[in-house]
Amino acid sequence: MKVTKFYNLKAEKHLIIQILVEKDFFLQIYTKIDTQVFYFQSHQILYRSINILHTKKVLINLPNLLSLLHSELVSETVINYLITLFNDRDNFRILNINDSLKVLLDNFIRRELQNSCAKIVSLTFNFNLSVETLLQKSNLLISNINTYNKKVSLKSISQLLLETILEIDKKTNRSTHVLTGFFDLDHILVGLQKSDLIIIAGRPSMGKTAFMLSLVRNVADIQSFPIVIFSLEMSSKQLIYRLISNETNIATSRLREGNISISEWEILNRAMTILSNLNIYLDDENNLDVLDIQSKLASLQQIYGDIGLIVIDYLQLLQYKEKSSQRHIELSYITRYLKLIAKDFNLPLVVLSQLSRNVEFRLNKRPILSDLKESGCLSYATNQPYFLKSDNVNFSKLTSLKVSNHYILSATLELLIPFQYNRIYPIVSLIKRELQTGYKVVYELDFYISVIVSTVEHYVLTLNGWKRILELTVDDLVATLDIQYLIYNNTEVDLFSSNVIFSSVINLICMNRINVYDFWIPKTNNFFVNALLVHNSIEQDADVVLFLYRDSYYQHNLKQSNIDMCEVIVAKHRHGTIGMVNLIFNPNTVSFMNLIKES
């Protein structure tokens, strides 16, 4: 079979020329175009050298690029080629740079697909692999390429303004969110937003599945798009019994026993007609992982069109076939992937989650975010996060907690292989909120180039993924900043490239009990402190976090009745306010209703 080489010489030349002649053009593409996107080696060398100029905060132009090429002893052939290319720049003026970028990326993706298909064919002959593993590895190869398909999106402000106005116009005529049917909750959330990851958490038997089914039933009644429930705990038949019980107000136990009167059969028949017309789909396959869910959704979308809402019951039962020695690392990967699924399919994705036992050991048993994330916290007196004040670009120590809307040094992590962060790029991120998380025992962690003081629950990035400080050993290597590289030119901050190194752990010492703090960094969910890269919580992948709490669950001496009150606590809401609403819980039918019915 003839092998076709996918490349476009003119497009590659055009991009190099554009970088050299147009000020700030490189800033628009350097995080989106990698060296390997270029097919010709000479262009790869030139683009890599341009990257170095940018990293060193040197103006990108022909003289500086030539100087760098000479200093790095690049061959005269490449240097002469660059001079010839630059002198020929006028011939590229009539070309559209966006077209050239599209052609460049199109050819790169075709090359990568060609290579991936060859790898997949090779994998099919490895009979030591199960079919499930083969499909997973194949999906991973293709999904990695798909990330490049979304990288380049240069748009003028006029184009963006037009798109925004059209979007606003659509919103005036059609709702772009999903109403839950719980009026007070919708008042806070303004419905469930597309591309959001929503976590509904509570202790066992608090009513998570019941709340989910009531929500799904409401949504299906309000809007007609397909709703998909992935139930990893209960069978489809169990869920159907619940739905029938909710619809007929007949207890599930009586339905299972067949203890139905003649008049109730009429109610049951009407309920069957109503439920049959709802656009709800159930999948009760167990041992699902996130790639299975992504694959199933893609198939469902081809059959039924756009999907309106996805529900997963529940998070802790989701699998990841490439096993990690620590479950919390798997869950961190899973939640991040679920968020990507919500964005890719442009729909709200609801995930039910268990809560830790920490709730049971407090007098006030209402859940808080730390019960979900179980993350650690930092001492501000002894640590130095790399802060950037909003009115200048100087580094500063953290001397108070009033740092909202200031900037901090964090990192983007490219997860090309699960649990292995292949590329780490320091970037500047906005601090959305600071949190005082308590008065706790802290430990001093000594490593090769610095020291950090933290609770042992806080996560740091190692070569094997995120680990709690308590779980670190002397064999672990943790992600740290190359400080000498960082302070280049004293105060410049936008010179970062891949200047993250891994340092060995030396010692862990218990210190004393002090006030500790955490930060909300919305996009990267991590930040550098004393040169160490730390995670600022697992739950940050979620856009909305809801907790369910019923007093009667703990107050067993309360008189039993046919109705019960349940608090739905909006503990996190990325798009708006937080708060609490009350709903009625019916233990007889295991369902939720609005506290005050619409007149």
Curated annotation (Swiss-Prot):
It holds the Pfam family DnaB. GO terms for molecular function: ATP binding; ATP hydrolysis activity; DNA binding; DNA helicase activity. Keywords: ATP-binding, Autocatalytic cleavage, Chloroplast, DNA replication, DNA-binding, Helicase, Hydrolase, Isomerase, Nucleotide-binding, Plastid, Primosome, Protein splicing, Repeat. It is found in: Plastid, Chloroplast. The keyword rRNA-binding does not apply. Coiled coil: none annotated. Gene3D superfamilies: DNAb Helicase, Chain A, Hedgehog/Intein (Hint) domain, P-loop containing nucleotide triphosphate hydrolases. Its EC number is 5.6.2.3, 3.1.-.-. Residues 171-439, 333-599 form the SF4 helicase domain. ATP binds at G202, R203, P204, S205, M206, G207, K208, T209. SUPFAM superfamilies: Hedgehog/intein (Hint) domain, N-terminal domain of DnaB helicase, P-loop containing nucleoside triphosphate hydrolases. GO terms for biological process: DNA replication, synthesis of primer. A replicative DNA helicase, it participates in initiation and elongation during chromosome replication. Travels ahead of the DNA replisome, separating dsDNA into templates for DNA synthesis. A processive ATP-dependent 5'-3' DNA helicase it has DNA-dependent ATPase activity. The intein is an endonuclease. Homohexamer. PANTHER family: REPLICATIVE DNA HELICASE, REPLICATIVE DNA HELICASE DNAB. Belongs to the helicase family. DnaB subfamily. This is Probable replicative DNA helicase. It comes from Guillardia theta (Cryptophyte). The lineage of its organism: Eukaryota, Cryptophyceae, Pyrenomonadales, Geminigeraceae, Guillardia. The gene is dnaB.
